[in-house]
Amino acid sequence: MTLPALSIVASPTKRLQILELASEAERRGFPALACPTLGNAFGLCVSLAHVTQRLRFYTAIQGIYGTSAAEIGSIASHIGEVSGGRFALGLGVSHEAMVKRLGVEMGPPLSDMSAFVEALRKQEKFGG
């Protein structure tokens, strides 16, 4: 039987327990962990890179508003490298109410995502 991916959040005051859970999930044969942006997905992914050996993990999802493509590209490249390629970057546009809270004007989602990915790809020579 193929096991599904699990989803975990780096809850404040529970981060060490979450990493222990990830190690246990790997031991039991789960293939991957989804890391929602709730609770700092990038920080969790860096930690997962260091406490697991085979488990794949990914952001689910990292919003494109509020952080530059250059910064996200650099972070994703770092995690990809230290994890031996087990990290995947999941991107999304979120929704208008959330984006407004960031003080950002949301454009057409497909156009915004296309422009973001284009900017992200331009960073490849610097980020890896």
Kindly give the residue locations of the regions a language model identified.
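A short, GP-enriched loop/loop-strand-helix hinge that lies immediately N-terminal to
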Residues: 56-62, 89-92
